C-alpha cells in the first residue's frame, strides 16, 4: 500500500547515501515508524523489489544521546537479524548501510502488509486461519528463544504477510540477547501487549526482572485479538487497564466467543498466566491440542463393488443432511422479543446490517473496544497504583497524562 508523501519523507541526497543509491532505486513510501520511513526499492542490477527502512540520524532531529541510542539499537537489530537469517517466518535482512546522516536496512518486500491491517479489514479471523498464523508465530518465537533472543515487541503491526499469506516476524528494535538465568528491567513495548512482570518491574525496584516469558504473554494477547477482533485488556482509564493486565482480568464475554472452541480458550488462558513460571513456553504451546490436526488416513483397499456401495451411502447421507438443514425450528414471538441477539440467525442479520452502516466499529459487548487496537502512545514512566477510585474527567485526564506508554 502506497502512502502519501510528506516533508518528513524526503529522500536523502546522493552524497549522504551514495553507497545505497549505487545499488538500489528508492520508490514510493509504504510505511512509517516513529523515527523511520519505509520505501519500496528496486535492485538496479536485477530489477527485484525490496523494502528499505530509512532512519535519519542527524543533530537536527535528535539529541547526541538519542543519536547514539538509535545507532546502537539499529546495530543491535542488524546483528540479531543476521543471526536469525533463514527462518521461514522471520523477515530477511538483505543489506544494511550506514552513513553520517542516515541508516538503511533493506528487507524482503511483504506485499500483503501488516497482520494488523488484515485484521482491521476482516474484523475477526476464523480458528482455522488463526491456527495457521499462531503456529508460524510460535515457531518463530521458539527459534528466537532457542537462540537466547527475546523480541519484546510482539504485536500484529510487527507481523507481516507475504504473497502466500504466510507470516514474517519483523521489527527487532527492542530485541536483545538474554542468557539463561539473566533478567531484564527495561520498560519497552506496547501497553496492551505488556506482560504483568514488565509492569511490576517498572514499579517495584525490588522486583527480580523479567525474561523470555514476556513474548508468550504477547502471543496470548495476539491470539485473543485475532479471534475476538478486539484486545483482551482495555479500559478508558489507562491506569485501570494496567491493573487488569497485572491481575490477568479478561473475559470471553463478547458474542464472538460463543462460536469458539474450549480448546482455543484453554490455550489463551495458559498463555495469559500472570505468573511467568506457570506460562507455557513456545514449545509447549505448539504441543497444545489446538494445533493438532487430523492427518490423512491411509487409503482403503476397496473392491469396485465396495467403492460403489460407499458412494451410494454417501449420496443418501448427503441427501438426508440437506433435508434436515431445511427443517428449521419455528421461531416464537416471545423468544424473539426476549433476546433477539441470542438467536444465531437473527444475530447474523443484525451484525450484517450494522456492519453495512457502521463498518468495523460495531461494538458487540461491554468488554469489546476495537478502537483500543489503534491506541499506541510513546514510551513513558508508570505511576504507583493506588486503590481504584471513580473520578471526573479531570481525574481521567490526569491518569492519562501520568500513564503515557508506547
From Swiss-Prot:
Superkingdom to which the source organism belongs: Eukaryota
EC top class named in words: transferase
Entry-linked InterPro entries: Kinase-like_dom_sf, Phosph_kin_gamma, Prot_kinase_dom, Protein_kinase_ATP_BS, Ser/Thr_kinase_AS
Annotated spans, Calmodulin-binding (domain-N): 306-330
Signal peptide from the UniProt entry: none
Keyword Membrane: no
Keywords (A to Z) from UniProt: ATP-binding, Calmodulin-binding, Carbohydrate metabolism, Glycogen metabolism, Kinase, Nucleotide-binding, Serine/threonine-protein kinase, Transferase
Catalytic activity: 2 ATP + phosphorylase b = 2 ADP + phosphorylase a
Disulfide bridge partners, by residue number: none
Keyword ATP-binding assigned: yes
Binding site for ATP: 30-38, 53
Pfam entry (one): Pkinase
Enzyme Commission number: 2.7.11.19
Domain Protein kinase: 24-291
Biological process according to GO: glycogen catabolic process; glycogen metabolic process; positive regulation of glycogen catabolic process; signal transduction
PANTHER family associated with the record: SERINE/THREONINE-PROTEIN KINASE
Assembly description: Hexadecamer of 4 heterotetramers, each composed of alpha, beta, gamma, and delta subunits. Alpha (PHKA1 or PHKA2) and beta (PHKB) are regulatory subunits, gamma (PHKG1 or PHKG2) is the catalytic subunit, and delta is calmodulin.
Purpose: Catalytic subunit of the phosphorylase b kinase (PHK), which mediates the neural and hormonal regulation of glycogen breakdown (glycogenolysis) by phosphorylating and thereby activating glycogen phosphorylase. May regulate glycogeneolysis in the testis. In vitro, phosphorylates PYGM.
Similarity annotation: Belongs to the protein kinase superfamily. CAMK Ser/Thr protein kinase family.
Protein name: Phosphorylase b kinase gamma catalytic chain, liver/testis isoform
Amino acid at each position: 500500500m502506497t502512502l502519501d508523501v510528506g516533508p518528513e519523507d524526503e529522500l536523502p541526497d546522493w552524497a549522504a547515501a551514495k553507497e545505497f543509491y549505487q545499488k538500489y532505486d528508492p520508490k514510493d513510501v509504504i510505511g512509517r515508524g516513529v523515527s523511520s520511513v519505509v520505501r519500496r526499492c528496486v535492485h538496479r542490477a536485477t530489477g527485484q523489489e525490496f523494502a528499505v527502512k530509512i532512519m535519519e540520524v542527524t543533530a537536527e532531529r535528535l539529541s547526541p544521546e538519542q543519536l547514539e541510542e538509535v545507532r546502537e539499537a539499529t546495530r543491535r537489530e542488524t546483528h540479531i537479524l543476521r543471526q536469525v537469517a533463514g527462518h521461514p517466518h522471520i523477515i530477511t535482512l538483505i543489506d544494511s548501510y550506514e552513513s553520517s546522516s542516515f541508516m538503511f536496512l533493506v528487507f524482503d518486500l511483504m506485499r500483503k502488509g501488516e497482520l494488523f491491517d488484515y485484521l482491521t479489514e476482516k474484523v475477526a479471523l476464523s480458528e482455522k486461519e488463526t491456527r495457521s498464523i499462531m503456529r508460524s508465530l510460535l515457531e518463530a518465537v521458539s527459534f528466537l528463544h532457542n537462540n537466547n533472543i527475546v523480541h519484546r515487541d510482539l504485536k500484529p503491526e510487527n507481523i507481516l504477510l507475504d504473497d502466500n499469506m504466510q507470516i514474517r516476524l519483523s521489527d527487532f528494535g527492542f530485541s536483545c540477547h538474554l542468557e539463561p538465568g539473566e533478567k531484564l528491567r527495561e520498560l519497552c513495548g506496547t501497553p496492551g501487549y505488556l506482560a504483568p512482570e514488565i509492569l511490576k518491574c517498572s514499579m517495584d525496584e525490588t522486583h527480580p526482572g523479567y525474561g523470555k516469558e514476556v513474548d508468550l504473554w504477547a502471543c496470548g494477547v495476539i491470539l485473543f485479538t485475532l479471534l475476538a477482533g478486539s484486545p483482551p485488556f482495555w479500559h478508558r482509564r489507562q491506569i485501570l487497564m494496567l491493573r487488569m493486565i497485572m491481575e490477568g482480568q479478561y473475559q470471553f464475554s463478547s458474542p464472538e466467543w460463543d462460536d469458539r472452541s474450549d480448546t482455543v480458550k484453554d490455550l489463551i488462558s495458559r498463555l495469559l498466566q500472570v505468573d511467568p513460571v506457570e506460562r507455557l513456553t513456545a514449545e509447549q504451546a505448539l504441543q497444545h491440542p489446538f494445533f493438532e490436526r487430523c492427518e490423512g488416513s491411509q487409503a482403503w483397499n476397496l473392491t469396485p463393488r465396495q467403492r460403489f456401495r460407499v458412494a451410494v451411502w454417501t449420496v443418501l447421507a448427503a441427501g438426508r443432511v440437506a433435508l434436515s438443514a431445511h427443517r428449521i425450528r419455528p421461531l416464537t414471538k416471545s423468544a424473539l422479543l426476549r433476546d433477539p441477539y441470542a438467536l444465531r440467525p437473527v444475530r447474523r442479520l443484525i451484525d450484517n446490517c450494522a456492519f453495512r452502516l457502521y463498518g468495523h466499529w460495531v461494538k458487540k459487548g461491554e468488554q469489546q473496544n476495537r478502537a483500543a487496537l489503534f491506541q499506541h502512545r510513546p514510551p513513558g514512566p508508570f505511576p504507583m497504583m493506588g486503590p481504584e477510585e471513580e473520578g471526573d474527567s479531570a481525574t481521567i485526564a490526569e491518569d492519562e497524562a501520568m500513564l503515557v506508554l508506547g
